[in-house]
Amino acid sequence: NVCKADIVIHSVHKTLPSLTQTALLHMNGEIVNREKVRKYLHMLQSSSPSYVLMASIDACMDFLEKKGEAAFAIYVERLQKFRERLSDLKHLKLVEALYYDKSKVIISVQDANISSRELTQAILERYHLQPEMTAGNYVLFMTSVSDTEEGFDRLCKALYEIDSDLETKKDAYIWKEMPRPAKEGEGRVALDYIYLYPPGCP
């Protein structure tokens, strides 16, 4: 089945190579009175449009026309391989569904001892990657045709390293403790938290 609409406002910048704020208005079929749409656009839109943004849309359309098919074929292949690589995560989980926009990578923290906010903070601070949204027990990452192999590798590496840290923290409670000097602590898991005082009270 093909879903149709009379008018669609399409944000170009979300998934295509175009500047933020750029969008297109699509009109379909004969129900929409195109002259009325043009009339209201002239009444409501700015008399000083951003030519930088409009040029960005033009460049995007040119890219799609000349290179779009080949670029999207590469993107789909990269995305599929990336999603397959995430199948071995032990605590974080890639959310999959039958009817689903595969370009949106949703990572669930439902079975992990970390919150979605903590995962977002770790991704930002340790790996300098920007998730699209944090909510409930998941984190959303947007991908696009502009993403490189290196970009997918960075996100995959970040998720696996965080996933491994979660496993380590969990296992720290069941492993046998072993006293060690602080200088030998690198690469080991602390049995308890270490705090600096003052200020505050232990």
Name each model feature, range by range:
Residues 3-37, 46-56:
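Active-site PLP attachment segment
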